[in-house]
């Protein structure tokens, strides 16, 4: 998984009910690491965490209980 002799990078963000902050967190990681894949692991949130993360370009995985 090396491209241009650099390792691939993935950012993994576990979260629960983070709709207030998740958009900024995803944007900041995408700006700091433009080649990285940003994954948000939503741990059964009851708010709009997953929706907001996806809208900001994160790859969202939902973890049901």
Residue ranges, per PLM feature:
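Structured catalytic core of nucleotide-sugar glycosyltransferases
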Residues: 1-65
């Amino acid at each position: 998984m090396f491209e241009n002799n650099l390792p691939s990078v993935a950012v993994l963000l576990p979260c629960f009910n983070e709709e207030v902050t998740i958009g900024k967190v995803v944007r900041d990681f995408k700006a700091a690491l433009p080649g990285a894949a940003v994954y948000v692991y939503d741990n059964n949130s009851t708010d709009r965490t997953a929706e907001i993360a996806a809208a900001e370009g994160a790859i969202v995985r939902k973890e049901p209980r």
